[in-house]
Amino acid sequence: MLYKGDTLYLDWLEDGIAELVFDAPSSVNKLDTATVASLGEAIGVLEQQSDLKGLLLRSNKAAFIVGADITEFLSLFLVPEEQLSQWLHFANSVFNRLEDLPVPTIAAVNGYALGGGCECVLATDYRLATPDLRIGLPETKLGIMPGFGGSVRMPRMLGADSALEIIAAGKDVGADQALKIGLVDGVVKAEKLIEGAMAILRQAINGDLDWKAKRQPKLEPLKLSKIEATMSFTIAKGMVAQTAGKHYPAPITAVKTIEAAARFGREEALNLENKSFVPLAHTNEARALIGIFLNDQYVKGKAKKLTKDVETPKQAAVLGAGIMGGGIAYQSAWKGVPVVMKDINDKSLTLGMTEAAKLLNKQLERGKIDGLKLAGVISTIHPTLDYAGFDRVDVVVEAVVENPKVKKAVLAETEQKVRPDTVLASNTSTIPISELANALERPENFCGMHFFNPVHRMPLVEIIRGEKSSDETIAKVVAWASKMGKTPIVVNDCPGFFVNRVLFPYFAGFSQLLRDGADFRKIDKVMEKQFGWPMGPAYLLDVVGIDTAHHAQAVMAAGFPQRMQKDYRDAIDALFDANRFGQKNGLGFWHYKEDSKGKPKKEEDAAVDDLLAEVSQPKRDFSEEEIIARMMIPMVNEVVRCLEEGIIATPAEADMALVYGLGFPPFHGGAFRWLDTLGSAKYLDMAQQYQHLGPLYEVPEGLRNKARHNEPYYPPVEPARPVGDLKTA
């Protein structure tokens, strides 16, 4: 053994060839600060070996290196910029020394090589991969950019265009694509990986492969003519501006850094990467996006822990076809759980099957599946007008009309047709689960399962625990949601549950602004362009359906009369009474026409202003700050109440439900992350300016306490040890 660290070791393989093996004590290899230091020590040992002829890098895990240790980021990024820069210089000196070894090097890459894992293998001369490879640089999705030389080596290896596509978008690619663009030199079966890598290494040692020529471009300026550079970087900057926008500084910073570094050799280019990385690491956007990553891990880990002792349902059923039922059936079948889809109406069944077929055909058009796979999936969806096959199902989700009487009748009838251990769930969006459970003989086998539309796109599923729902019932439904590729979050029961309960105060803020003379077009523009929502409230209401919102608004008002009962006729009432239901009938806040692709395109409609004039004061202008405050305060207050009342368990779950269920702007990180960034005292000052608008603007006592003691909702993160104290040699 040449060297043994906590997460890697170095040993001789055969005559003059050494292997450096990543083998962390945990289930995966991560490139944390300790591993970077160990790598430096191992390379120091290699540099002393006069008889060294070649080096093989490999992993003892199912994945090579999954990336840096993201849990370290929040504390590491709190150290002063100068110290962070110093540590990055050290880390890059380690990879430079790996790259500068006087012998050929190869990485045998299996599974994931992401972020720092990808940057590590970019420093070797050759890369051989297995078919399960996923390799790339996802840093911009975390609000940062590659910091271990990825923005320097990748463009010089692949050319600017391919590298920019991966780095700016935070992409990873599979084995075939990696081979095609030159990110790896070959792909072999897993059992042949080491044998194949050794064969390449021997060829390089023997002089059959010119490893020095392979290494040289990574040390030099990027080989691009002035015209090529102008085209590549102009197109990349345009694409980034269009897709990322102003709220995500990392992608455009990465592109500009690669452009600026193009004319320099490795050392100066790495200095430019360092200078760009450090300020990004200190942005609120990076903290928010890293927070989302960590929250996502927490939520998925919680679901995994919850379901460890239950069997995932093998056969499911959906009650109620149509668009929603068809979407649920598709998602279940697509992920391998056959489903019976029942409706009392043949036309609805046809609509549900058409929806599932349409979604599968889209996968076919994109080349994700072939005709055989399509036929196989669709054959596992069984439409029926009766209860045939229900005696075999493990779980049933009801997705009929949002009417408590209808839902109770359907659920009670279904309970008589299934096994005693079959779990029933309702896809209601607002009706309390405990109320629906009153119709059942086995309420312990019942819970809520709230999908979001469109089902195939929206990651969140709210799992609602009723008063009598058993732990096993919740676990089984969480297991099914996870199997469907969704992110399940368990919430406690109340009208609207979590997501709709906090959404309708937001809509109430919108209605009050309109009542007071604001223009809905400006509100939408501000909430989209300035705050960052994917849709403004008017557009969102049109997509949800004015009729749906009108009904849900009444349910929420009955559930929370003190705050949500309004004493005036609002814009939603006015549009509903005029039969303007949104996109579904082409008339809402906008007039909708289909474009050439059959998608609804919104157009101005003067009739709306006349309708709104009946329920509004004369038009007046509101500042962007006032619009944002009046829209967000009711929502954030309600989010805080949900945490205080135990409707949602943690700030992390609340923020993920908002991001995944409503599209809360990820660069804000969710309501609690936004609150922490703003500061609870500053938020309280802002909210008090609007408390005259009514109970929705009254700040909950728990939040007032936070403001008094200057306490955040997320545990405060301590800065990493001074970088000088980290192992840097």
From Swiss-Prot:
Single GO molecular function: NAD+ binding
Domain of life: Bacteria
Any Pfam family: ECH_1
Sequence segments annotated as region (Disordered): 708-729
GO BP term, pick one: fatty acid beta-oxidation
Binding residue positions for NAD(+): 324, 343, 400-402, 407, 429, 453
List of residues binding substrate: 296, 500, 660
PROSITE patterns for this protein: 3HCDH, ENOYL_COA_HYDRATASE
Coiled coil: none
Complex and partners: Heterotetramer of two alpha chains (FadB) and two beta chains (FadA).
Annotated PANTHER family: TRIFUNCTIONAL ENZYME SUBUNIT ALPHA, TRIFUNCTIONAL ENZYME SUBUNIT ALPHA, MITOCHONDRIAL
Function: Involved in the aerobic and anaerobic degradation of long-chain fatty acids via beta-oxidation cycle. Catalyzes the formation of 3-oxoacyl-CoA from enoyl-CoA via L-3-hydroxyacyl-CoA. It can also use D-3-hydroxyacyl-CoA and cis-3-enoyl-CoA as substrate.
Protein name: Fatty acid oxidation complex subunit alpha
Gene coding for it: fadB
